[in-house]
Amino acid sequence: MPRRRVVGQRKILPDPKFNSELLAKFINVIMQDGKKSTAEKIIYKALDTASEKKGEDHLVILEAALDNVRPSVEVKSRRVGGSTYQVPCEVRPVRRNALAMRWLVEAARKRGEKSMALRLAGEMLDASENKGTAVKKREDVHRMAEANKAFAHYRW
């Protein structure tokens, strides 16, 4: 642990089109090899497509999708006397968002549509309706935590 002062978190600049910090973070998650403009094009195209299909506002769809993918508990490995236990722990809000975004992008990359924008739009629509691969991932994590509830007293 550092003995000096705790370094504060950097302020993230909101994205240029919708002026949303959440969307700016999502763009950074999508971005590969530092190609931010490409990531922005993909996200904006995906949001436009999803908005057309569902008939709702862009940010409402994104927020609904992320809400349905955010985990509330996860398991962490903890060694106790030679054996390793999967201990269920609550997820901090910042990590919840990060995991939700990461899972949404991973699920979109595995889909079969032609372009990444269409894949992401499809996954966001699925997630906003509480179905799809990203939501399944969240359910699996929650199920794992529920199964290991007996080890909750090992929490640290």
From Swiss-Prot:
Which InterPro entries does the protein's record reference? Ribosomal_uS7, Ribosomal_uS7_bac/org-type, Ribosomal_uS7_CS, Ribosomal_uS7_dom, Ribosomal_uS7_dom_sf
Top-level taxon of the source organism: Bacteria
This entry carries the following GO cellular component terms, namely: small ribosomal subunit
Q: Which UniProt keywords apply?
A: Ribonucleoprotein, Ribosomal protein, RNA-binding, rRNA-binding, tRNA-binding
Give this protein's Gene Ontology molecular function annotations. rRNA binding; structural constituent of ribosome; tRNA binding
Q: Report the Gene3D superfamilies cross-referenced here.
A: Ribosomal protein S7 domain
Enumerate the SUPFAM superfamilies for this protein.
Ribosomal protein S7
Q: Does the keyword Repeat apply?
A: no
User: Disulfide pairs?
Assistant: none
One BP annotation, GO: translation
- Identify the Pfam families for this entry: Ribosomal_S7
Job description of the protein: One of the primary rRNA binding proteins, it binds directly to 16S rRNA where it nucleates assembly of the head domain of the 30S subunit. Is located at the subunit interface close to the decoding center, probably blocks exit of the E-site tRNA.
Q: How does it assemble?
A: Part of the 30S ribosomal subunit. Contacts proteins S9 and S11.
HAMAP family for this protein: Ribosomal_uS7_B (MF_00480_B)
Q: Which family does it belong to?
A: Belongs to the universal ribosomal protein uS7 family.
* Name of the protein this chain belongs to: Small ribosomal subunit protein uS7
Origin species: Shewanella piezotolerans (strain WP3 / JCM 13877)
Native organism taxonomy: Bacteria, Pseudomonadati, Pseudomonadota, Gammaproteobacteria, Alteromonadales
Which gene codes for it? rpsG
